[in-house]
Amino acid sequence: MGMTITEKILCRHTDLDEVRPGMLINAKVDIALGNDVTAPLAIDEFRKAGGKKVFDRDKVVLIPDHFTPNKDINSAAQCKIMRDFAREQEITHYYEVGEVGVEHALLPEKGIVLPGDLVIGADSHTCTYGALGAFATGVGSTDLAAAMLTGEVWFKVPESIRFVLSGTLNPWVSGKDLILYIIGKIGVDGALYKAMEFTGDTIASLTMADRFTIANMAIEAGGKNGIFTPDEITEAYVKPRAKRPYTFYASDPDAAYAQVIEIDVNRIEPQVAFPHLPSNTKGISEVGQVPLDQVVIGSCTNGRIEDLRAAAAVLKGRKADPRVRLIVIPATQEIYRMAMKEGLFDIFLDANAAISTPTCGPCLGGHMGILAAGERALATTNRNFVGRMGHPRSEVYLSNPAVAAASAVLGRIAGPDELK
């Protein structure tokens, strides 16, 4: 019996000839990632374990993105721990404020993560890199510490669910809508500890930005990882960025799956996730009247240049409702520069938006857009749990960037088709 793409990548990072779901394995990592929230804990554990030098300074990546630029003394202390460690260890891939971006947008952009890689990160949305055809998953800080010390980490090989997407996307429908629809269909535990493998004829029409968004939110269905088979679109993205060899893997025709789920995308309209779970989804036509206090466009889910272009196309010549605070956060400095050169910032500023330097900021209730009790936000982020963006009595809704932009203009959740 053949292996899935996830099983193949895991196997190639061991000394085994094959792996099967349920096996416990030790695997070598290509990238071990930490951020300003999780890395300080890992550094402490690394030192407690007697660590003097990381296993490979080129493979340990440290990104201060969650509370940067630092919002307070505690966040400054967290970043200083990581910064000092990066300098001490001569870490190749440490990016300071002014150069840093939201980690899961920055690493692919820099060519740090490549197809066929095995990536662990002390951040649950590390699964984003599956869009490139890599095995990528989130771990705890102690596992990151072990990886920094040894270059290895243990896994239980996951079963795989194959999602077969067929058909053509409707207007204003993006990768965000596909993954929200899937999560709404299977639930937040519908893929618990399983690889979510995305296939079907629709995939060829998806941009890399769409694929990153879909893989990013695999964890919201409980997935161990999300993954795409690399193709010509992947190659076009990776080739100019890669500074080392990479490998394209694909599932064998006779690979075994725990489940196969077929999705007809022709039937999907823009989706909105209602509080307080990403699975609590409705089509835009079913939303009703939901007034808003804030709209956030950005994050590791939807802060790429394609996302900003989609929002700008809707906002051009329009202004945000005066009752709505509109915040736009490009995910990296490169995206920031591209948006500026393309005139997107003029559109955002004319719409009365606040434009931020790259940061995770409001997504995790960190800073740059915290909600008060009773306030309601629509965000292009990935989670809408109780208190996710501020007060426990606030509400967060999730959508794609075009819907977010239209909603900012109308002051309520709405699709772009409602604009005149």
UniProtKB/Swiss-Prot annotation:
Q: Which GO terms describe its molecular function?
A: 3-isopropylmalate dehydratase activity; 4 iron, 4 sulfur cluster binding; metal ion binding
UniProt pathway: Amino-acid biosynthesis; L-leucine biosynthesis; L-leucine from 3-methyl-2-oxobutanoate: step 2/4
Per its database record, what is this protein's job? Catalyzes the isomerization between 2-isopropylmalate and 3-isopropylmalate, via the formation of 2-isopropylmaleate.
Q: What broad taxonomic lineage does this protein's source fall under?
A: Bacteria, Pseudomonadati, Thermodesulfobacteriota, Syntrophia, Syntrophales
Reaction equation(s) it catalyzes: (2R,3S)-3-isopropylmalate = (2S)-2-isopropylmalate
GO biological process terms, alphabetically, are:
L-leucine biosynthetic process
Concerning its family, UniProt says: Belongs to the aconitase/IPM isomerase family. LeuC type 2 subfamily.
Gene3D superfamilies xrefs: Aconitase, domain 3
Protein name stated in the entry: 3-isopropylmalate dehydratase large subunit
| Family matches, as InterPro entries | Acnase/IPM_dHydase_lsu_aba_1/3 (IPR015931), Acoase/IPM_deHydtase_lsu_aba (IPR001030), Aconitase_4Fe-4S_BS (IPR018136), Aconitase_4Fe-4S_dom (IPR036008), HAcnase/IPMdehydase_lsu_prok (IPR011826), Homoacnase/IPMdehydase_lsu (IPR006251), IPM_dehydratase_rel_enz (IPR050067), IPMI_cat (IPR033941)
The cofactor named in the record is: [4Fe-4S] cluster
Please give the subunit comment from the record. Heterodimer of LeuC and LeuD.
Q: Which residues does [4Fe-4S] cluster bind?
A: C300, C360, C363
Superkingdom field: Bacteria
EC number of this enzyme: 4.2.1.33
Question: Looking at the keywords, is Metal-binding present?
Answer: yes
Q: Which keywords fit this entry according to its UniProt record?
A: 4Fe-4S, Amino-acid biosynthesis, Branched-chain amino acid biosynthesis, Iron, Iron-sulfur, Leucine biosynthesis, Lyase, Metal-binding
Q: How is the cofactor bound?
A: Binds 1 [4Fe-4S] cluster per subunit.
